[in-house]
Amino acid sequence: MRILLIEDDMLIGDGIKTGLSKMGFSVDWFTQGRQGKEALYSAPYDAVILDLTLPGMDGRDILREWREKGQREPVLILTARDALAERVEGLRLGADDYLCKPFALIEVAARLEALMRRTNGQASNELRHGNVMLDPGKRIATLAGEPLTLKPKEFALLELLMRNAGRVLSRKLIEEKLYTWDEEVTSNAVEVHVHHLRRKLGSDFIRTVHGIGYTLGEK
């Protein structure tokens, strides 16, 4: 899951980016309001964590512009503004959730996962395809009921494919979902991850659509 984080507090921002990265999220972090606002237009983010008090452009103005321009990415407001009127205003501007500082990182992750479930119309955290089960919240994967050991990028790729079952995902889109701007990506990185997953899940689990990308095979 690729997350856009817009937070000007260096300590908080670093803690969120580091903590979520360890949980398997890919996080792009911006400290300036305008830069963060523009970032949403240039990459396929799954969710946004937005502070309200930002240099350059207030978080409420950013959110208002996104919604007016049709951006529908789920937004979690994370701010010290805890007054009822502030929370109501943020939600009415188009935020999907609101969390006041101080916070526990595990709750931030849980709220992001809940936003993704609602976005994808899921009732449960678990993703299933054939005899493969994935629980992104618990970072658990099983094959025919047996524990499956996956590296972080393998887990992220499998989650992406399972969340988009029935769709063909291009290599470019997969790269954009799996890697942040400050990560180096080799030309065959996606192919390598697909190869490793096929070795663990079976050669037919991921299907190559030549000239287009990858999709899950038949159940």
Curated annotation (Swiss-Prot):
It comes from the Bacteria. Residues 2-116 form the Response regulatory domain. Pfam families: Response_reg (PF00072), Trans_reg_C (PF00486). Residues 124-218 bind DNA. Induction: By the signal autoinducer AI-2, through MqsR. Transmembrane segments: none annotated. Keywords: Activator, Cytoplasm, DNA-binding, Phosphoprotein, Transcription, Transcription regulation, Two-component regulatory system. GO terms for cellular component: cytosol; protein-DNA complex. The keyword Electron transport does not apply. It is found in: Cytoplasm. The keyword Phosphoprotein applies. The modification 4-aspartylphosphate is found at D51. GO terms for molecular function: phosphorelay response regulator activity; transcription cis-regulatory region binding. SMART domains: REC, Trans_reg_C. SUPFAM superfamilies: CheY-like. GO terms for biological process: DNA-templated transcription; regulation of DNA-templated transcription; response to metal ion. Phosphorylated by QseC. Member of a two-component regulatory system QseB/QseC. Activates the flagella regulon by activating transcription of FlhDC. Currently it is not known whether this effect is direct or not. This is Transcriptional regulatory protein QseB. It comes from Escherichia coli (strain K12).
